[in-house]
Amino acid sequence: MSKDSTSLGVRTIVIACLVLLGCCIVEAVPTTPSSQPSTPASTQSAKTVDQTLLPTETPDPLRLAVRESGILAEDGDFYTCPPPTGSTVVRIEPPRSCPKFDLGRNFTEGIAVIFKENIAPYKFRANVYYKDIVVTKVWKGYSHTSLSDRYNDRVPVSVEEIFTLIDSKGKCSSKAEYLRDNIMHHAYHDDEDEVELDLVPSKFATPGARAWQTTNDTTSYVGWMPWRHYTSTSVNCIVEEVEARSVYPYDSFALSTGDIVYTSPFYGLRSAAQLEHNSYAQERFRQVEGYQPRDLDSKLQAGEPVTKNFITTPHVTVSWNWTEKKIEACTLTKWKEVDELVRDEFRGSYRFTIRSISSTFISNTTQFKLEDAPLTDCVSKEAKDAIDSIYRKQYESTHVFSGDVEFYLARGGFLIAFRPMISNELARLYLNELVRSNRTYDLKNLLNPNANHNTNRTRRSLLSIPEPTPTQESLHREQILHRLHKRAVEAANSTNSSNVTAKQLELIKTTSSIEFAMLQFAYDHIQSHVNEMLSRIATAWCTLQNKERTLWNEMVKVNPSAIVSATLDERVAARVLGDVIAITHCVKIEGNVYLQNSMRSSDSNTCYSRPPVTFTITKNANSRGTIEGQLGEENEVYTERKLIEPCAINQKRYFKFGKEYVYYENYTYVRKVPPTEIEVISTYVELNLTLLEDREFLPLEVYTRAELEDTGLLDYSEIQRRNQLHALRFYDIDSVVNVDNTAVIMQGIATFFKGLGKVGEAVGTLVLGAAGAVVSTVSGIASFINNPFGGLAIGLLVIAGLVAAFFAYRYVMQLRSNPMKALYPITTRSLKNKAKASYGQNDDDDTSDFDEAKLEEAREMIKYMSMVSALEKQEKKAMKKNKGVGLIASNVSKLALRRRGPKYTRLREDDPMESEKMV
C-alpha cells in the first residue's frame, strides 16, 4: 500500500504540475478559438482513412485543455503514414549502360578549287572582206539635178584576191564580181577600167574593231546634156578586223558587224575537225596551212605562220585562225580557290565545308569522271596549277599531300577539285606504324582509301603473307579462270566502247546563286553544335544517374522512407526487408493539426525530440476523432510519440510546421519563424551551356554583271555603234568627213624641204612654223565666222559701223556747209531767234550793211579759237600718256603765243547799231 500510495501521490503531483503549466501557457500564448480553422490550400487525398488510427477512448478534460492551448497550423499540408507491412515491395533499378559520345566523323582536310559552268562565249578575232557597191541614178534637168534611184549591195571578196592583193600588196581591186539571180554581174569603180587601189585606215572605228577601205567618196556623175538620166558606180573594198563569238555547242559564230556564220569556228580539214558542224558547201570553205597575213597598218607580214580558215558567204568573206577545240574551248571555268577545306563523310555523302565563304557543298562519295562532261580537259591542268600554287605558298613546310586530285560533282552544278593532305606529324605516325607492322601499303591509299575506287588493291609483301605452292590442279584451274576473265574483260571493253559512243555527254549546269550552300553551312554548324551539346549532356546525365544510384542504394538503408519518397515523388513510409523495400502510401490529413507548446514528457528527465501534436484525420471531427501524435520531418505527423531524448540544457530547435518554422528553446515554444529569415543553401548543380557563336553570311556572286552581260551571241551595243558609224566610215559626207587640204599642202612643202638635206629641212621647219601660225590664225578666224554666233556678231558690228559712218559723213558735210551752225548750234539758234524778234519776219533783206572791221575780228577770233582747241587737245593727250614731251610742247606753244603781242583790240561793250537805232 505504501508503494501504491507513493506512486499515486507522485502521479497526482505530476498532473497538478501539468495543469499549472498548461494554465501558464494559456496565459502567455493566446489560444486559437474553437471556431472552424482555415483549410489547407493543397488538394485533398482520395484515399480512405485507416479506421485503426481513430481513437476509441474518450479524452479526459486534461487532454482537451492541452489541445486547446496548442498552436493551430494555419497553412501547409500534413501527412500521416501507416507502418509498412510488406504487402507492397519495390527494388532499385540496376545501373544502365550510358551512350558513348561521338567525338566526330571522318574528317579530311585539304586544298580545293571550285569550278562553275562557263557561260561566257568563246571569243576570237576574225577578218571580214567585202566590197560595197553603190549605183546611183541622177536626173539632170535644165536648171536642177535630182537623185532618182540608188542601189547598194555587199559582195564578198574572192579568196584569190585576198591572197594576191590584200595580204600580198596591201591593195584591192576596183572591180567587183557577184552573182545575183543566177547572173554574174560586174561593177567598176567610177565606171573606169580595173585598177589596184591602196587600202587606207578608216577614220572612224569602234574600240573593238579596225577597218580599211579603198575610198571615202561615192561617185555621182552628172553630164552636161540636160533632160537625161546619168548612172554612176562606186566600188569600195573594205577589210574589217572584228570580234567573233561562239557559244556551246559551237556550231556557229557571230561577228560584231551583225553577220552570223553558220559553221563551227573549230571546223577544219583535219580528221577531228571535220566532225564539226558546217552548213556551207565545201567549195565555199578553204583552209590554208602556214599562212602569213599582212598587217595593213604597218604593211608588214606576220612573223609566225598560222592555219587560216576562209569561208565565203553570199555577202562577205570571213577568215580566222583555226585552233583545236579541246585547247581553246572549255565548258567549265574556275570560280573559287579554297586554301582550307574540310571534307567529312556523313550518311553516304561527302560534305565539303568552307569557312572562308560560309558554305557547305554536298556530293556523292564516288568521284566524278571528267570524261562524262564535254570539253573539260582544261579543268585538270587549272586545278593542279592552282592547288600546287597554294601548297607552295602556305603548306609546303607543314603538310604533305595524302592523295591525288579528286573531282566531285556537288549539288547545284559545282565541280570540286579536292586534294587531301595531312600534317607532317601525322604522316610520321603513319610511317612508323607501317614500319612497325612490316607492311608495304602505299601511304596515299592507306591515308585516303576512297581516292580511287577503280584501282586494284595493292598486294602485301612476301614477308608478311607466304604464297602457297601451286599444284597441277590449281594451275589448270588458274588457266581456265584466266581465259574466262580475259573474255569477260573483252566483252566489258566492247560494251563500254559502244556505250561511250552512244552516250550523249551532258553539260554541267550551275545555279546562279549559292544561297542553298550557305544555308546548308549554317544548318550544319547549328546541327553539329546542338548535337554535340545534347550528346554530352546525355552522357553526363546517364553517368550521374549511375553514380547517384549507388548513393540511393546506400542511403535507403539509413532513411528508407525519405529515399523512396524522393524516388517515387510521393509520400510513402518504407522499411527495408532484406534486398527489397516495403512501402505504404501516406494519407493527407484533412483535419486540424495542433502543436503543443512544450516538448517535455511526464518523466522529468525525458523530453520529446520532436514537438508533440494533436490532430484529426477528417474535417469537422468530434472530440473522439482527436489523435495524439508527434510532428515528423517535412510536415509528416506520426501517430505515436516515440521520439524521445534525455532533456538537455540550453536546447534550441527549429521545426517545419506547415509553410513556416517554429522555434523551441529549452523544450518550450517561443515563436514562429518565417522562411525568409533562414538562409537557404542550394544543393543543385548549375548547368552551364555554351551559346552558339555568331556567323555572318557574306553576299557572293557566282556570275558577275560583266559575265552576265557577256553571255549573248551578239554584242548589240557593238552592232549599233558599227551600224551608226558605217556611213561615216566609208562614205563622203561633207558635214562629217572633211578633207584637210591645208595639211596636204603643208605635207608637200615639208617633203620638198626634206629633199634639200639638213639645211633645207631646218629652213623648212622655220617656214612651216610661220606658215602654220598664219594658217592657224586664218583658220581660227574662218571657223569663228562659220560659227552662227560669230557670224551674227560680225553682222551686228558691220551694221553698227555703217550707222556710225553715216552720222560721221553727215556731220562732216554739215561742217563744210555751215561750220558755225555745226560747232555752235545753240548759239546760232538763239541769235536767229533774237534777230527775228528784233526786226520781225520781213526784215531779212537788210543784210548788206556789214562792218568790215568786225568781220575781220571775227575771223581772228575763229583762228585763235581753233589754236586754243588744238592746245587743249595736246595737253589732254599728254596728261593721259603721262609723258613730259607733250607738256613741254604745249608750254612752248603758249610762250610763243604770248610773245607775239596783242593783235586785236578790246571789243566795245555797247552796240553801235543799237545806239543808232535809239537815235
Swiss-Prot record:
Compartment(s): Virion membrane; Host cell membrane; Host endosome membrane; Host Golgi apparatus membrane
What's a single GO BP term from this record?
virion attachment to host cell
Intravirion side, ranges: 810-919
What segment(s) does the record annotate as region Disordered?
Answer: 900-919
Query: Region labeled Hydrophobic membrane proximal region — which residues?
Result: 733-786, 765-785
Q: What is the lineage of its organism?
A: Viruses, Duplodnaviria, Heunggongvirae, Peploviricota, Herviviricetes
Q: List the disulfide bonds.
A: C81-C586, C98-C542, C172-C237, C330-C378, C607-C647
Which Pfam families does the annotation name? Glycoprot_B_PH1 (PF17416), Glycoprot_B_PH2 (PF17417), Glycoprotein_B (PF00606)
GO cellular component terms attached to this protein's record? host cell endosome membrane; host cell Golgi membrane; host cell plasma membrane; membrane; viral envelope; virion membrane
**Keyword Glycoprotein part of the UniProt annotation:** yes
> How does the UniProt record describe the way this protein sits in the membrane?
Single-pass type I membrane protein
What is the protein named?
Envelope glycoprotein B
